[in-house]
Regions:
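Structured soluble/peripheral alpha/beta segments that form catalytic or ligand/cofactor-binding pockets
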Residues: 1-170
Length: 170
């Protein structure tokens, strides 16, 4: 909570946020073309992070995640605890890349439906990171009811991600 000043007027604000810090000893393992990553804040106060590192055929090299309960207890989710099933695709009119924007995420025998707030959330980072990818806001549904909201990142659908991209001279 705090204060936000807009046009010289102070307004009280309150909200929820998360800090995302990604690190690895390598960019992508051999055979991988990209990743699908999700961070969700659920309405019951819990939070979910789930990801998979993907081969060109769509199969997973790695699947992993964490589920933080409302009381702060954290549970690690391994390969067999998670499943990612794309349900609907969207093709970018700018890049021509086809992204799986709607998903069924399986978590230990239960599932969530992930729907984007809008399909067109493609980011063109060719001038900086060298990648075009889809990254945007999603809502999570269970049995047709909204149960959370979050962020989904989809990389490597246009071409495999590689280090050393970016603008000339970088």
């Amino acid at each position: 909570s705090g204060w936000l000043t807009v046009d010289g007027r102070q307004r009280p604000v309150r909200g929820v946020a998360w800090l995302d810090h990604e690190w690895s000893s390598e960019y992508l393992p051999e055979g991988a073309v990209g990743w699908d990553w999700l961070g969700l804040n659920l309405d019951d106060g819990s939070a979910l992070m789930a990801a998979r590192i993907r081969r060109a055929d769509g199969s997973a090299l790695w699947r992993f995640g964490t589920l933080r309960a409302a009381n702060g207890e954290v549970r690690e989710l391994g390969f067999d605890a998670l499943s990612f099933e794309p349900l609907r695709h969207w093709r970018s009119p700018r890049s021509g890349v086809r992204y799986p924007v709607s998903w069924r995420l399986g978590i230990d025998g239960t599932s969530l439906l992930l729907e984007p707030l809008m399909d067109d959330q493609e980011l063109d980072g060719r001038a900086s990171t060298g990648a075009i990818y889809w990254e945007g806001a999603v809502r999570a549904l269970r049995d047709g009811r909204a149960v959370g909201r979050g962020y989904l990142e989809l990389t490597g659908y246009g071409e495999a991600l590689r280090l050393g991209g970016g603008a000339p001279g970088r």
